[in-house]
Amino acid sequence: FVVLAVFAVFSFIKLPDIDAEDQGESAADDVSVHTAPLIRQPHFILGIATQFFYIAAQVGVNAFAVNYILENAIVRDASGATDTAPLFTWYGSLLGAANPKATAAYIVTFAMVLYAFGRFSGAAIARVVKPNLLLAFYGIDNSLIILLVMADIKHVSWLVLPFCWLFMSIMFPFIFAMSLRNLGERTKIAASAQIMSIVGGAIAPPLMGWLADSYHSMAICFILPLLGFIAPTLYGLAYPRLLEKSTRAAAA
């Protein structure tokens, strides 16, 4: 609530742009620049909301990945005996992991490699595919991955989780850039408001932990990341209409 209150105050305050002369940009000379108050520009406001949900999803997935992988790949029966997924065992022996937790950590490291690959490949793909459509497509991919994770198919669901990082890779920069489009001299204060949306990352882990403890299952707590990935999907699909509404608000 504090973050929202601060944003609400600053969105109506005219702050000086110290680089305005250097940039040589003027809202009066560029019809593409939106001069309406930020609060009246839906592509920006919903961009902040989308970033909030996405960051919550990203931090939640990062925080609970190792625990989920261990629970899904290593099944314990009532007697306490364990049944470990063959691929999990093979991967651990291949890397010389000292214990199952180390193996799970190596899997998350592989996921980080996918994240880096996705960031570069996503930037290249965005040259031929509209960024909003690419964002929506990646959001759909991650939603499907999380649904498989929530299905909790023993020895199987953990295999798809690392690919979540591949499709998360472009989300933050794409949402950030799309929400700041055509804001002109308001871009700086708008960017500051966007950065405040990362507070979502502080909210998801406690809620996911509560769900996991309440239902005695790591799988159920991934419903929060699912919601977080649906948000970029909807934002990407609706983006052209949102931008058009912002343009009309600026012209009014």
Predicted ranges, named:
Residues 1-25, 233-240:
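C-terminal membrane-cytosol helix-exit motif in multi-pass small-molecule transporters
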Residues 19-47:
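Juxtamembrane intracellular "pre-TM" segments in multi-pass secondary transporters
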Residues 36-109:
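Extracytoplasmic gate region of multi-pass secondary transporters
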Residues 69-70, 125-126, 209-217, 221:
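Interfacial helix-cap and linker-helix signal at transmembrane-aqueous boundaries
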Residues 117-131, 212-213:
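Helix-to-loop junctions at the C-terminal end of transmembrane segments
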Residues 133-148:
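Structural signature of the two symmetry-related core transmembrane helices
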Residues 169-184:
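Intracellular juxtamembrane helix-capping segments at the cytosolic ends
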Residues 182-217:
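A late C-terminal transmembrane helix in Major Facilitator Superfamily
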